[in-house]
């Protein structure tokens, strides 16, 4: 059972590796057009062969991934219930479990903060400051966090964390391909991403969407849901989160604001926080109905949401 879960994660990583190497091969093909040496045709043939081989490798991994669900569907459900969603401290066996657990315990707040970042510059600065986070343990934590968030019906937050999980996987894969320490080459990844280099962003967004689709698909399988079931769940109740649970999860300064119901103090606190973190807490407070000093009529409710959003920017 555990090996099936490991094979699924291996499929995710191998798919990213194949896409990245394919983009590198295509980049080489484009570069050859700028040179005019006697060996151009030979180099072009080798690069084209490499591109074809990588495309075939990616196709094979896609087939293996689909077979995981058809060969043993009931086992898949057991594996994801036990190994990904329900047990918060169950980590992949690619590294020493004790080492992974200790790493998470020491750095969980930083890992969560990185998972909430949305801009390339913010992620690069954060990793430059906390370069010890550039490792497999971080990638594993973010991947498993995505499955847990989707299981908790927190799809928007899952998609945010998925972006950062794929960022970390691409950095690690670039390091493996170039045989460098990932802490020494992560800036190169962000340079390519921010420059919008042709091919690389397409690969990134393709893999990101594929990963999010896999998370949703396997979560539906593990809970026995069907796509039709999820349509009815897209209309949440007026208060879809437990107010007590949300309140306990807030930073102390936000708890004070909620208790005082003072909009000016709240605005000052939010302006001093990381924008992504502030947005996360604001959405949860609204969904839990913790902000009550503005009457919630149908007209006022939309203006209240707009006021919260204005404070985030």
Curated annotation (Swiss-Prot):
It is found in: Cytoplasm. The keyword Ligase does not apply. InterPro entries: Cdc37, Cdc37_C, Cdc37_Hsp90-bd, Cdc37_Hsp90-bd_sf. Signal peptide: none annotated. Keywords: Chaperone, Cytoplasm. It comes from the Eukaryota. Gene3D superfamilies: 6.10.140.250, Cdc37, Hsp90 binding domain. GO terms for cellular component: cytoplasm. GO terms for molecular function: heat shock protein binding; protein-folding chaperone binding; unfolded protein binding. GO terms for biological process: protein folding; protein stabilization. Pfam families: CDC37_C, CDC37_M. Co-chaperone that binds to numerous proteins and promotes their interaction with Hsp70 and Hsp90. Forms complexes with Hsp70 and Hsp90. Belongs to the CDC37 family. This is Hsp90 co-chaperone Cdc37-like 1. It comes from Danio rerio.
């Amino acid at each position: 059972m555990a090996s099936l879960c490991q094979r699924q994660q291996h499929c995710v990583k191998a798919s990213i590796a194949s896409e990245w190497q394919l983009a590198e091969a295509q980049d080489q093909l484009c570069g050859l057009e700028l040179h005019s040496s006697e060996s151009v045709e030979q180099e072009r043939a080798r690069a084209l062969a490499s591109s074809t081989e990588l495309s075939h490798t990616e196709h094979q991994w896609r087939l293996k991934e689909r077979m995981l669900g058809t060969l043993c569907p009931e086992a898949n459900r057991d594996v994801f219930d036990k190994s990904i969603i329900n047990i918060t401290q169950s980590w992949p066996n690619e590294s020493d479990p004790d080492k992974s657990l200790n790493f998470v315990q020491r750095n969980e707040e930083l890992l969560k903060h990185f998972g909430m970042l949305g801009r390339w510059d913010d992620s690069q600065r954060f990793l430059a400051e906390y370069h010890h986070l550039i490792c497999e343990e971080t990638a594993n934590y973010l991947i498993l966090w995505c499955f847990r968030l989707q299981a908790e019906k927190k799809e928007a937050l899952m998609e945010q964390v998925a972006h950062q999980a794929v960022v970390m996987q691409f950095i690690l894969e670039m390091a493996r391909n170039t045989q460098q320490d990932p802490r020494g080459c992560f800036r190169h990844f962000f340079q390519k991403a921010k420059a919008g280099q042709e091919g690389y962003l397409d690969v990134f967004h393709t893999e990101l969407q594929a990963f999010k689709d896999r998370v949703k698909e396997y979560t539906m399988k593990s809970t026995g849901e069907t796509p039709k079931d999820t349509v009815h769940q897209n209309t949440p109740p007026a208060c879809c989160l437990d107010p007590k649970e949300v309140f306990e999860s807030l930073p102390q300064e936000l708890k004070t604001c909620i208790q005082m119901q003072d909009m000016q103090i709240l605005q000052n606190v939010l302006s001093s926080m990381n924008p992504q973190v502030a947005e996360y807490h604001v959405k949860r407070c609204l969904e839990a109905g913790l902000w009550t000093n503005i009457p919630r009529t149908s007209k006022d409710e939309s203006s209240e949401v707009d006021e919260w959003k204005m404070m985030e920017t």
